[in-house]
């Protein structure tokens, strides 16, 4: 892009470009190649309740939140995640919230850990 987001600089772009040049895209794309297999392997746990303390953090502009199942999964958190200690949708943030909102994410994580 002509203008980089505030959370990425030219050194970051150079690093990623060098790594993709060195190793290619295969590793990153393998996640998508295995979606069906992952679904099959995880089928025995579909609908399982996660009782451990948990927290959900996402960016409101994250495309994953627009997936058809995302809203229904979030709506079911009270049932599927009874140990949920926070559900945070960060305004204006996208998919890379740990980079885009590092200080805010760190504060949420530290608060979560302090509460354990």
Predicted regions and their residues:
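Alpha/beta-hydrolase
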Residues: 1-68
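Alpha-helical elements of Rossmann-like donor-binding domains used by nucleotide-donor carbohydrate transfer enzymes
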Residues: 15, 27-34, 72, 76, ...
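Short alpha-helical interface elements
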Residues: 40-45, 56-57, 79-81, 106-115
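Conserved loop-alpha-helix segment in the C-terminal half of the alpha/beta-hydrolase fold
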Residues: 48, 55-93
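Catalytic active-site module of serine/aspartate enzymes centered on a nucleophile-bearing elbow/loop
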Residues: 82-116
């Amino acid at each position: 892009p002509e203008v980089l987001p505030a959370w990425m600089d030219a050194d970051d772009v150079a690093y990623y470009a060098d790594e993709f040049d060195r190793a290619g895209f295969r590793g990153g794309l393998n996640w998508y190649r295995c979606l069906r297999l992952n679904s099959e392997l995880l089928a025995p746990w579909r609908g399982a309740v996660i009782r451990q303390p948990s927290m959900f953090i996402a960016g409101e502009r994250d495309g994953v939140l627009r997936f058809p199942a995302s809203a229904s999964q979030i709506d079911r958190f009270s049932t599927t995640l009874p140990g949920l200690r926070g559900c945070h949708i960060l305004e204006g943030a996208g998919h890379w919230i740990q980079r885009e909102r590092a200080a805010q994410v760190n504060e949420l994580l530290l608060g979560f850990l302090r509460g354990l």
